[in-house]
Amino acid sequence: MSELQTLKAYLTQLPGTLLKLLNIDPPHNTIPEAIPDILDLYQGIERISINLIDNFGLFEITYLKPQFMIANSEVMLLLSTKNPYTLGVLHQLIYGGFEVEPNGFHLLKAINNGGKSSCLIGRQKDIERYDGGTKSIAKDTDMSTWVESAKVINTHDLSWMHYLDFENLHKQQQRLRQRTPEDLIEKLINRTDKWILGNYKQLRQNSLMIIIGDHGRVKLDLEYSGKIAQWREASVPIAILMRK
């Protein structure tokens, strides 16, 4: 990761950045400004594919080193936010802040109103809360999300897949007293890394893939110790970017 360009930004800057990259002017003085360095690097891309992964951040990419992401990432954004958990991250990405539709802003609606198409794939409850009536597909498992992703990543200007198996699998394993959450996180991240590699191979040229990590639905009591525990505690959400 020594050659990876690392930048700091606010999570709430991503909506404006996504719009600008899709040649849509963000509403003035409604959401935070776009990230200038990202606009300079990726201006002219034709489509964006977002993979949102629960329980994934700076600690996990550094400690677990998922092979595809490490090998292909060009830029890593360290995302500053008051709420790094799943619903907080979704809210800030959709609304550009913590208000609901501030001054009427909704990211997916703005993309559609700008003449571009979008598709959100994720859990039914999240879709009902956040799609704003735009095109969405509800899926119950990460496997079904990944299978569906192959149909949308090249047919929409913005495709957005949410990988969130950890929550249900962790509950199952707590009941059965199987596998620690640390082991489960590692297994799911490495599995999703392989799936995202498959998407990357399928993406048409001049696409931008963005992998966003959040802290999951709830705070976990993990069993890391010593410096690793301190490292994990200081972890922040990230976005890693790569052009196809």
Language-model features and meaning:
Residues M1-K244:
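Feature captures the catalytic ectodomains and active-site-proximal regions of enzymes
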